């Protein structure tokens, strides 16, 4: 039997490969880089380990399900450690909000910001849980292949006011601006503007309250390695440094996948975990339907990009939380500039990752591994020269962190590297250097998103951030479940 080919060993591609292999379908997993993981790549330098991308595990059950399919337990392959608080949220005014899973502690903190918002938060949590039940548990792994699928979901989505933005819905319950930011920033974790993204994405709050926030011992890369080992234990084949040049088609069927080094792999089906525009524009450029789909996709709104700094210090800043969100002086205005303006803002808001707070093995003794990211416009919004802007932004961020959060940072610096929108474009083939693929606005969600199964090329499937349900680890693992269901129907 010719194997099924999965292009890309990100979380979505890995999860799909495991599901297919566990069901008895031989899978060939092709990864263009020298390590699996996709955006969850790992850098190692002078004893420091840096997770390149996702660092927040919020639905362990979705990962555990993959291992259960093989009759295994997640804990046999990787240990998940609880993270408390989930996030520490900080403002330049000096205000701090430790967001965790203890209702009493949360309400006590909310009381200090605005007593009236305690009841408002309870109502918001009820709403978030209702959206979580409908949008995540019911619809998160259901492929939307026809408009009828969308119509069936429409009444409940209307009841939940899905046309409202995340921020608008939060603001309908909560008065204090700090708290509005605290409960609306989550959509930025999946590339969504809180002022434009559907309020359905408030479900992320309920998701975290339901299952907590976790971190793999050894870093997110250890989870990737655990999933690779599971896939190989099932008999799956992984090929690294396998850069796909194109897919060979006969009529509306893919016959083979070609690599840039000349290798050719016959296949019975292809699931692409690569960027969706790259898949249609570059890998299927000879197929008329793919060209049409590529042109259509290039008119869609893409999510923002990111500027990321990985740095190792000869000092462990134990005053930090594992996850810190550093809000700058502006919120709405800054986000508007990131998503809609041709230029780079003078100010920024940051996410600071300090994993040694939870797992000290990620740095030499007494040292600390860190990364900090700033949301920035993608290259289609602001076509900046990041060889110029990158070093300037790096210096501004290091100075800011040293002043506000990490005294002595620059004198403690052992190693650092940058990852810019150019790198998202060049290393990950991300269209416009987008960090999260298609922007998750309502008119680009569910049926309006690129479908998990192509409607013309009969054995082409999509998995990952660019298809339903969207970005984030729970999203792409959910997409793998949706796509696997379709493939098993078609291939068995």
UniProtKB/Swiss-Prot annotation:
It is found in: Cell membrane. GO terms for biological process: carotene biosynthetic process; carotenoid biosynthetic process. It comes from the Bacteria. It is an enzyme of class 1 (oxidoreductase). It catalyses: 15-cis-phytoene + 4 A = all-trans-lycopene + 4 AH2. It holds the Pfam family Amino_oxidase. One of its GO terms (cellular component) is plasma membrane. SUPFAM superfamilies: FAD/NAD(P)-binding domain (SSF51905). Its EC number is 1.3.99.31. PROSITE patterns: PHYTOENE_DH. One of its GO terms (molecular function) is oxidoreductase activity, acting on the CH-CH group of donors. Keywords: Carotenoid biosynthesis, Cell membrane, FAD, Flavoprotein, Membrane, Oxidoreductase. Gene3D superfamilies: FAD/NAD(P)-binding domain (3.50.50.60). Inhibited by NAD and NADP. InterPro entries: Amino_oxidase, Carotenoid/retinoid_OxRdtase, FAD/NAD-bd_sf, Phytoene_DH_bac_CS. Belongs to the carotenoid/retinoid oxidoreductase family. Converts 15-cis-phytoene into all-trans-lycopene via the intermediary of all-trans-phytofluene, all-trans-zeta-carotene and all-trans-neurosporene, by the introduction of four double bonds. This is Phytoene desaturase (lycopene-forming).
